[in-house]
Regions:
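A well-structured
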Residues: 1-163
């Protein structure tokens, strides 16, 4: 029984990982190969993919699978499996606190903002980037309020990189 649930978890996490790989490839292409003028379309692609990823990462079936694995015979599993379950559950809990709309808007703005930043830097017109930065900070504050409403926005965001 445990083996079946763990295999389901691995299958779901592999699919998420593959989609994250596609996201990384789109980002790499944007930085290296993408032709000028394609930024708007790429931002929409990244937003759509971010939405699909979010749906998979917040799928109730994934949550059910994680809860079953966490509650039943955790001692019977190896350290690697327990760590995978712990990290997947941590990600699941975090992602379920954030609405899909916000995930997509952050992804789209980040992609679109990159092109604006590149042009602003080339032309030494950093004020052109200010509205993007202002909106991005506003969205990150909203994200922080979703995941940790009782914390400062900085603390909620830094916890992604420096836990604790």
């Amino acid at each position: 029984m445990m083996n079946h649930h763990y295999q389901q978890l691995v299958q779901k996490l592999e699919e998420i990982s593959h989609l994250n790989g596609v996201m990384s490839t789109l980002g790499w292409d944007q930085e290296v190969m993408m032709p000028l003028g394609a930024g708007e379309a790429r931002a929409k692609q990244i937003s759509a993919l971010a939405g699909g990823l979010h749906e998979r990462m917040t799928d109730p079936a994934l949550g059910d699978c994680l809860r079953v694995l966490q509650e039943r015979n955790a001692d019977a599993m190896g350290a690697v499996e327990r760590c995978n379950i712990h990290e997947a559950l941590r990600s699941y809990v975090l992602e379920t606190k954030v609405p899909k709309r916000l995930v997509q808007e952050l992804a789209e703005l980040s992609s679109r903002g990159h092109g604006i930043w590149v042009m602003a830097r080339q032309q030494n017109r950093f004020a052109d980037f200010a509205p993007v930065l202002k909106r991005f900070l506003s969205l990150k504050k909203e994200w922080a309020h979703c995941v940790a409403p009782d914390s400062q926005p900085y603390d909620a965001n830094i916890d992604l990189f420096e836990r604790g």
